[in-house]
Regions:
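Core nucleic-acid recognition elements
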Residues: 1-166
Length: 166
């Protein structure tokens, strides 16, 4: 049951309101006119879930089939696309992950899934390194978020060492 699975969920074009708004913000607020398209995907990293429960949750918990496209493991992106992900800092409450964990437990109450989420941005267009940094600064609130690593972790379980006596 262990082993981390990664799922990306993206709103279909007519329903991709967040992507459209971000494209307008990048062009209007940041003044970067060379971005021609923006995609926003929700990334779920999932561990401690049986294959049966995972398959059920894929189309009921993680996505809504009429409005979402689901990609397992990886998603299609152009070679020149600018891709980065944003996750909550350790210790910050992730409501999306918590809700997904609770919903998945309805399928099998004996499983204790560990789910972590991130938002992945895919920007199409020509941008300089300075413009990339400005876009990241716009999308990442340093108070509660950070840029996420793109590789799949070996485990999602966080081990905390017992502190020494004072």
């Amino acid at each position: 049951m262990s082993g981390v699975k990664r799922v990306f969920v993206e709103k279909k074009k007519p329903f991709a309101v967040n992507a459209k708004e971000l494209l307008e913000e990048i062009g209007g607020y940041l003044g970067i006119k060379t971005i021609t398209d923006v995609r926003v995907l929700i990334r779920y990293d999932i561990e401690n879930l049986s294959e049966e429960t995972y398959k059920k949750a894929l189309t009921t918990v993680f996505s809504e089939p009429p409005v979402d496209d689901v990609y397992e493991g990886t998603f299609p992106a152009g070679n020149d696309d600018f891709v980065f992900s944003v996750e909550y800092l350790p210790g910050q409450f992730d409501q999306r992950a918590d809700s997904a964990e609770q919903c998945v437990k309805f399928f099998n109450e004996n499983e204790t899934p560990v789910i972590k989420t991130a938002v992945t941005y895919v920007l199409t267009g020509t941008v300089t390194d300075e413009e990339k940094n400005r876009i990241k600064e716009h999308c990442i609130n340093p108070v509660d978020s950070r840029q996420a690593a793109e590789d799949i972790p070996e485990t999602l379980v966080t081990e905390f060492k017992t502190p020494a006596d004072v």
